[in-house]
């Protein structure tokens, strides 16, 4: 069983991630994790915070000399800006005289539309949005990317699975239909200012970001994640919570600001007749194959052996320089929302986070299917499973 948790606040000393159930023998380093976190900071339209706030990676358990031990993996992602927040975000009681006059400690009483502020204040009984927004912040995804790096390494080394993402829509701009990057395209995607594989669309996306920034506004978009080398048989049809497409949808919807998930050509299939919506099956020299992959590599909640393909729709960031209308909860009077420092667009980064989430779900399913004591055991079990397939 593979499971994980994160802890920590946006302006706290660190985020912490704990990943349990990782097989022994996965090769991964601090440098690799730092590299993935650097990818999370990519993208045209990011805010000033990305320029000066650094992720300080420390592996504090589960590895020795760059190899997992089979015990829980614990990763600390330190916040280089912590000294500025040490008093305001201190976990222990602080004398009121130390807090007096600190602008960062001023109560945030004007909740932002579209953010967790108001709902969280109501649920947990806070009169200040700070305790809510600190945890609701997308900063938490740094911890997900950290453990997602371990999951990617496991998938690659044990099963030969590679995960890649790209931006397919940003604002009103979309890439050419049918553009499907392979893992070999990863560096080229990351080199693009918006992690877009379509150069012409990327230019228009940059202009869209510039226009939104000029208007003190924000933008959303759509990212696509593909996983190659996924064997048939991960997931199950027998219970609702074992269907892999449901688990992927849950994982992707849990990412901050994600409002929709599509498996394969889901929305287009809904508009099509059955005769052109499904993937016909044909015999080949290497076994049965599907002519197309409209299903996105999943049928009945089970992987088909075709490339897995999912999309996630991200709404525009809810913290705007052009603040929206709200209510000051201390007075009950109309007000403009608080304006926390934020990005114009974080869609490229959402793709990196979505990769991590897809990898974690696939790694969990792989441990369920092929065992989890060691990478060697998983490889052996995968080979035996594929050799014994009744239908190839």
From Swiss-Prot:
InterPro entries: Chorismate_synth, Chorismate_synth_AroC_sf, Chorismate_synthase_CS. GO terms for cellular component: cytosol. NADP(+) binds at residues 40, 46. GO terms for molecular function: chorismate synthase activity; FMN binding. Pathway: Metabolic intermediate biosynthesis; chorismate biosynthesis; chorismate from D-erythrose 4-phosphate and phosphoenolpyruvate: step 7/7. FMN binds at residues 135-137, 256-257, 300, 315-319, 341. Reduced FMN (FMNH(2)). Its EC number is 4.2.3.5. It comes from the Bacteria. PROSITE patterns: CHORISMATE_SYNTHASE_1 (PS00787), CHORISMATE_SYNTHASE_2 (PS00788), CHORISMATE_SYNTHASE_3 (PS00789). It catalyses: 5-O-(1-carboxyvinyl)-3-phosphoshikimate = chorismate + phosphate. SUPFAM superfamilies: Chorismate synthase, AroC. It holds the Pfam family Chorismate_synt. GO terms for biological process: amino acid biosynthetic process; aromatic amino acid family biosynthetic process; chorismate biosynthetic process. Belongs to the chorismate synthase family. PANTHER family: CHORISMATE SYNTHASE. NCBIfam families: aroC, PRK05382.1. Homotetramer. This is Chorismate synthase.
């Amino acid at each position: 069983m593979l499971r994980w948790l994160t802890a920590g606040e946006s302006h706290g000393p660190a985020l912490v991630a704990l990943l349990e159930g990782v097989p022994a023998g996965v090769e991964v380093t601090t440098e690799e994790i730092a590299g993935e976190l650097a990818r999370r900071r990519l993208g045209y339209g990011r805010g000033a915070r990305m320029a000066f706030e650094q992720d300080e990676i420390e592996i504090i358990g589960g590895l020795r000399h760059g190899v997992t031990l089979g015990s829980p993996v614990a990763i600390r992602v330190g916040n280089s800006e912590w000294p500025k927040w040490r008093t305001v975000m201190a976990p222990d009681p602080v004398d009121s005289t130390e807090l007096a006059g600190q602008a960062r400690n001023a109560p945030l009483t004007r909740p932002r539309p579209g953010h967790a502020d108001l709902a969280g204040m109501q649920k947990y009984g806070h009169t200040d949005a700070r305790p809510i927004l600190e945890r609701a912040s997308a900063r938490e995804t740094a911890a997900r990317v950290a453990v997602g790096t371990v999951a990617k390494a496991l998938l690659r080394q044990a099963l030969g699975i590679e995960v890649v993402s790209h931006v397919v829509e940003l604002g009103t701009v979309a890439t050419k239909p049918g553009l499907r990057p392979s893992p070999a395209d990863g560096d080229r995607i990351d080199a693009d200012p918006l992690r877009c594989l379509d150069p012409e669309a990327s230019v228009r996306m940059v202009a869209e970001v510039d226009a939104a920034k000029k208007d003190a506004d924000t933008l959303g978009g759509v990212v696509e994640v593909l996983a190659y080398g996924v064997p048939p048989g991960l997931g199950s049809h027998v219970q609702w919570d074992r269907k892999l497409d449901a688990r992927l949808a849950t994982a992707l919807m849990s990412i901050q600001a994600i409002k929709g998930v599509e498996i394969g050509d889901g929305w287009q299939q809904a508009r099509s007749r059955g005769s052109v919506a499904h993937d016909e099956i044909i015999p080949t020299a290497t076994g049965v194959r599907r002519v197309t992959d409209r299903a996105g590599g999943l049928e009945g909640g089970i992987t088909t052996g075709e490339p897995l393909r999912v999309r996630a729709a991200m709404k525009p960031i809810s913290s705007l320089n052009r603040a929206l209308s709200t209510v000051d909860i201390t007075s009950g009077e109309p007000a403009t929302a608080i304006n926390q420092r934020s990005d114009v667009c974080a869609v490229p980064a959402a793709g990196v986070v979505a990769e991590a989430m897809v990898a974690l779900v696939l790694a969990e399913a792989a441990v369920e299917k092929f065992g989890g004591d060691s990478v060697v055991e998983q490889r052996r079990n995968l080979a035996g499973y594929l050799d014994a397939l009744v239908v190839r």
